[in-house]
């Protein structure tokens, strides 16, 4: 298994993203969001795509966001096989090596929610320290609304989990809008 720079390969990234979101039972972001992000930020050094492959087949990838001395582990995706084989660990290890070599001072593992046990386990294996992110609302508290792991979304998540991938792609286009 190898890890390589993916440049602006939004198509490879998006296929992995679709597989991950389906496994999690979540709608994907629109493809144009990632295409725009990669095409705008990678050439400026403000983002980087890393892809783990085995025999030429992509197994996992991450999009890193760079700002000054900070790196944010912004988005991660994998195939089920990549998850079993630790491809996400290889990508994260490569990202950490790159951050250190680039003189970055902070590596932010990104946001999560208390109910995202698998994600929290993955991050804790890498000695990540969880810190609360302040949120502000006007009116009623929306903490439970913003957590996609909340039991209130269980039925909806099952629907996304069993949706054929072409329909999942369309659902992402319909449910999340990015100009």
Question: How would you label these PLM feature ranges?
Answer:
Residues 1-84:
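A conserved beta-strand-loop-helix scaffold within acyl/acetyltransferase catalytic domains
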Residues 13, 87-91, 104:
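Short amphipathic alpha-helical coupling segments at ligand-binding clamshell hinges
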Residues 83-97:
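Conserved acetyl-CoA-binding loop-helix of GNAT-fold acetyltransferases
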């Amino acid at each position: 298994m190898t890890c390589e720079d993916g440049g602006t390969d939004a198509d490879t990234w998006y296929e992995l993203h679709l597989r991950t979101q389906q496994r999690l039972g979540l709608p994907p972001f629109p493809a144009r969001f990632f295409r725009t992000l990669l095409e705008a930020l990678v050439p400026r050094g403000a983002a980087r795509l890393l892809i783990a492959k085995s025999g030429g087949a992509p197994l996992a990838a991450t999009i890193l966001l760079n700002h000054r001395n900070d790196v944010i582990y912004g988005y991660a995706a994998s195939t089920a096989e990549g998850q079993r084989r630790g491809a996400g660990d290889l990508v994260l290890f490569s990202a950490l090596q790159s951050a250190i070599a680039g003189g970055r001072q902070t590596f932010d593992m990104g946001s999560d929610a208390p109910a995202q046990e698998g994600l929290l386990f993955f991050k804790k294996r890498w000695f990540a320290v969880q810190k609360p992110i302040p949120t502000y609302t006007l009116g009623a508290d929306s903490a439970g609304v913003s957590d996609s792991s909340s039991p209130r979304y269980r039925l909806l998540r099952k629907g996304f989990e069993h949706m054929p991938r072409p329909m999942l792609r369309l659902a992402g286009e319909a449910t999340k809008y990015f100009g």
